[in-house]
A protein has these predicted regions:
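Interfacial loop-to-helix junctions that mark the boundaries of transmembrane helices
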Residues: 1-6, 95-105, 134-135, 205-209, ...
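Selected transmembrane alpha-helices and immediately adjacent juxtamembrane segments
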Residues: 1-42, 128-179, 263-264
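Residues within membrane-spanning alpha-helices of integral membrane proteins
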Residues: 8, 51, 106-110, 114, ...
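Membrane-interface helix caps of multi-pass small-molecule transporters
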Residues: 20, 35, 88, 92, ...
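Membrane-interface alpha-helices at helix entry/exit sites of multi-pass transporters
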Residues: 41-50, 72-78, 172-183
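Selective hydrophobic functional segments
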Residues: 48-101, 190-240
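Transmembrane helix exit motif
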Residues: 60-68, 107-133, 246-261
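Hydrophobic alpha-helical transmembrane segments in multi-pass integral membrane proteins
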Residues: 89-93, 145-157, 193-201, 208, ...
Length: 264
C-alpha cells in the first residue's frame, strides 16, 4: 500500500480520536484500530502501528500525571513484572494468529465494550475503596495481572480501565492510588508489546508517526474535556463511533478463515 495524503490525514484523525477517548475513559484503540484497518493495513500491522500512538499517549499521560501527583512506583513496579510477561506473550500471539481470527476477537471485544458501557457504573463514584489491606492471595493478584498482560499484548484497547477496575475492586486500592498505579504500568508495558511488533515487521512507521501526533494532541484535548467536566458528550460520540466500527468490521472487512488459524 502506497500511503496518500488522505491516508496520513486519516491516521492523524485516528490518533486524535483515540487520544481523546483514552484520556476520558479508555479504550480509544477501539476507534483507531478499525480506522487503520480501513486504510488497507492488515489487522496485525494495524495493531502494531497503533501501538506507536498508544505509547505516545501513555508516556505523555504519565509525565502530566507526575507533575501533579506522586506515583507509588514500588508497588506498581512489582505488579508490572507479571504484566510485562503477559504482554510479551500476548503480543507474540497477536502477530502469529491469522488476521481473520483476530478480527473476530476484536469484534467481540467491541461488542462487550458496548454492553459494558451501557450497564456499568463509574468506579470513581464508589467511596468505599480504601488502601487498607484485605485478606487475599498475592499469588492470585500476580496471575490476574499476567492475564491482563496477555490481553494488553494482543488487543490493548481498554487495558488501562481493566487495570483500574482490578486495582479498585479486587485489591481494594483507593481510586486515586489506583489511577496513579494504572498510569505508570500502562506506560511501562507498552514498549514491550511494541518491540514484538517491530521484531516481526508489523509496523507502518509513517502512519504510526501520524497516529502518534494525533494521539498526543488528542490526549491533551481529552484532558481539557475532563477539566471542563464535559465528558458525557464525548462518551456518547464514542458509543456511536464504536457501533459504526462494529458494523464496518462485520460488513466490509474480509473475515474468511482461508489462511489457517495460527502461524508457528
Amino acid at each position: 500500500m502506497e500511503p496518500t495524503l488522505i491516508h496520513y490525514a486519516t491516521a492523524v484523525l485516528a490518533g486524535l480520536a483515540s487520544g481523546i477517548v483514552s484520556e476520558i475513559g479508555g479504550a480509544g484503540s477501539l476507534i483507531s484500530l478499525p480506522m487503520l484497518i480501513g486504510l488497507g493495513l492488515p489487522p496485525s500491522v494495524a495493531n502494531g502501528t497503533n501501538r506507536i500512538g498508544v505509547m505516545t499517549q501513555y508516556t505523555m499521560g504519565y509525565i502530566r500525571y507526575l507533575t501533579r501527583k506522586p506515583i507509588p512506583h514500588k508497588e506498581a513496579a512489582i505488579l508490572s513484572v507479571t504484566l510485562v510477561l503477559g504482554t510479551v506473550g500476548g503480543a507474540y500471539f497477536a502477530v502469529r494468529i491469522a488476521d481473520a481470527v483476530f478480527n473476530w476477537i476484536f469484534i467481540g471485544v467491541m461488542i462487550l465494550t458496548i454492553l459494558f458501557t451501557f450497564f456499568s457504573k463509574e468506579l470513581t463514584d464508589r467511596p468505599d475503596s480504601t488502601d487498607d489491606p484485605v485478606s487475599r492471595s498475592r499469588a492470585v493478584d500476580y496471575l490476574v495481572f499476567l492475564g491482563l498482560g496477555l490481553y494488553c499484548g494482543m488487543i490493548q484497547a481498554g487495558m488501562a480501565y481493566l487495570m483500574f477496575y482490578v486495582l479498585v475492586k479486587r485489591m481494594h486500592t483507593a481510586t486515586k492510588t489506583a489511577e496513579a498505579i494504572k498510569t505508570y504500568m500502562s506506560m511501562i508495558v507498552t514498549p514491550f508489546a511494541l518491540f514484538i511488533f517491530i521484531w516481526f515487521g508489523h509496523i507502518d512507521w509513517e502512519l504510526g508517526a501520524c497516529v502518534a501526533v494525533g494521539g498526543g494532541f488528542g490526549g491533551w484535548l481529552g484532558e481539557k474535556f475532563v477539566e471542563r467536566k464535559d465528558t458525557h458528550t464525548v462518551k456518547d460520540w464514542f458509543m456511536v463511533a464504536l457501533i459504526i466500527s462494529v458494523v464496518y468490521m462485520l460488513l466490509f472487512v474480509q473475515l474468511h478463515l482461508h489462511d489457517g488459524i495460527f502461524y508457528l
